[in-house]
């Protein structure tokens, strides 16, 4: 499902009073009062016509007009109050949607030696392996050496980070939990990792009220001896922390990870509308739009949305495909793509929009910013 933002309807007020019509009604009632005082009451002077014809007609008109005008004023006040509350609610949801996680360390091992830099050049130079699952560039590895490399690179990005390291989350496809990887992680960081098969623990960090310490998220999409090689080998590691804690500890933030928006089946257009309205992303200034998953369907959906919503896509390469270089996505495509986007944002100093859509038309949208909003 998409973000649980309520659809608040517009409140309609009563139509504005047509004063010219009420003046016509007043003249008609005054005329009727005069005629009735002359014919029915047989008034013979102006005072009787005024007292028994004009004055009652005017008072009746005044009562009716006052009642209608009061209802109109109440309706207008109710609409103003409704609009103010609606705007306040929208502002609160925008703040909720724009919450970020600070990334202070990011490591990516992929089939390409240069990582995301290979995908950022001219299109003719971008590696093309859309149907092939490839091994890591350094295919001769073991978990101990990988964890040692991750630790070394994270230490270079944020010296002495281990003093603030609080937890380690391991994201791995269901049925692929490996004791050897957990043992290697424990030996490297002296922390028992928590293992998950989804990004749920990452999602929960956005709404955490605690100023937690550093969290290391390691995502493993590697080949075992007996597993089918359906997706390329990619391994990532990220140091995640709340923006408040990052500012408090003067951490070197390299990117901001905005709240991830799940996609609803068949609701791509409405999801994009909600995303751009609440996430703070300026669609016209986005230079890097990345797609993964069902790329053909996603490309068609984006083109249709752009044509119908006056979205000027980047001229040179309006879309960048992760799968074009790294092949069919695996179960961990989303968290691995987030690490790729952080690396891309760090290399380009530009925001990155990730659109991940599965053949079932589920998936996620996420904006990765090259700096924090605050």
Tell me the role of every PLM-derived stretch.
Residues 209-215:
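Structured nucleic-acid-interacting core domains from mobile-element enzymes and related host factors
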Residues 1-207, 221-222, 226-227, 236-374:
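Conserved "HGTGT" condensation-loop signature of ketosynthase/thiolase-family condensing enzymes
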């Amino acid at each position: 499902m998409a973000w649980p933002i309520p659809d608040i309807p517009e409140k309609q007020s009563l139509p504005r009073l047509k004063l010219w019509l009420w003046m016509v009604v007043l003249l008609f009632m005054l005329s009727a009062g005069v005629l009735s005082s002359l014919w029915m009451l047989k008034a013979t002077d102006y005072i009787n016509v005024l007292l028994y014809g004009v004055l009652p007609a005017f008072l009746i008109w005044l009562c009716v007009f006052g009642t209608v005008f009061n209802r109109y004023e109440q309706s207008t006040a109710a609409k103003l109050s409704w609009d103010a509350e609606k705007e306040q609610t929208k502002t609160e949801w925008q703040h909720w949607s724009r919450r970020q996680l600070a990334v202070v360390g990011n490591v990516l091992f992929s089939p390409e030696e240069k990582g995301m830099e290979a995908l950022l050049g001219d299109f003719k130079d971008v590696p093309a392996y859309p149907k092939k699952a490839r091994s890591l560039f350094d295919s001769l590895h073991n978990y101990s050496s990988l964890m040692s490399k991750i630790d070394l690179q994270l230490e270079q990005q944020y010296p002495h980070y281990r003093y603030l390291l609080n937890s380690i989350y391991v994201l791995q496809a269901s049925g692929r939990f490996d004791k050897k990887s957990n043992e290697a992680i424990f030996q490297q960081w002296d922390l028992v990792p928590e293992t998950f098969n989804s990004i749920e623990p990452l999602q929960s960090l956005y709404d955490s009220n605690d100023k937690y310490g550093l969290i290391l998220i390691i995502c493993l999409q590697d080949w075992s001896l007996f597993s089918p090689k359906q997706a390329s080998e990619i391994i990532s590691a990220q140091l995640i922390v709340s923006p408040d804690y990052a500012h408090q500890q003067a951490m070197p933030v390299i990117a901001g990870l905005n709240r991830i928006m799940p996609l609803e089946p068949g609701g791509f257009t409405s999801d994009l509308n909600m995303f751009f309205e609440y996430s703070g992303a300026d669609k016209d200034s986005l230079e890097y739009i990345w797609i993964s998953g069902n790329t053909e369907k996603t490309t068609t959906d984006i083109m249709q949305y752009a044509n119908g919503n006056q979205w000027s896509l980047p001229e040179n390469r309006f879309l960048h495909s992760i799968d074009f270089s790294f092949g069919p996505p695996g179960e961990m495509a989303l968290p691995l793509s987030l690490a790729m986007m952080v690396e891309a944002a760090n290399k380009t100093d530009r925001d990155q929009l990730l659109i991940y859509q599965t053949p079932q038309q589920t998936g996620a949208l996420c904006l990765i910013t090259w700096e924090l909003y605050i």
